[in-house]
Amino acid sequence: VTTNGFPLPLDTVTLMDVLSAGGYQTALMGKSHLQYFTDNKVRPETFGIKSEKHLPPSELSQATRKRIDGPEYSNELRSAWDADPYRGVNLPYYGFQEAKIALFHADRVGGDYSAWLSENHPDPMSLRGPENALENSNVSAPQAWKTRMPEELYPTSWITGLTLDCLDRYAKNDQPFFIQCGFTDPHHPFTP
């Protein structure tokens, strides 16, 4: 693995595809890591390579020889969500009939969460990151700060709420269901 976020090819048959074909309702709430989530490219220095001319050819830069990129692989790309926080993912998403995506970690989570946070707080950026952290002398670890984000607005609460709402909806009928709940934390940076 040369970088995080290699995408799963869109033509891959997933467990969710099989469950959906069998009559299941399927939902993804939160983090998934099924596609690229950053625009970062592999850096030669990461591997002790002094020059890009020593990198493998581009056709060997991914896990498959067929290129896996383009707009259809931008469902989890942070820059795409920053440009349009209300974009949503293309459904079905790897067999999930319903999906609300959370990208990254701590109080800096993006994806569908950013749109929700904007609808539920007048100035969401004032709650995010170490530059807006609360004073706390007990937090001294690198990549850690005491977040200003209230618990009810924190990504964990959002993902929990979505999952519980989905459970309530799905439980009201006789159709079987599968819900994947992917929390973004615990993960660095830590925001106790």
Give the role of each language-model region.
Residues 1-192:
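Formylglycine-dependent sulfatase
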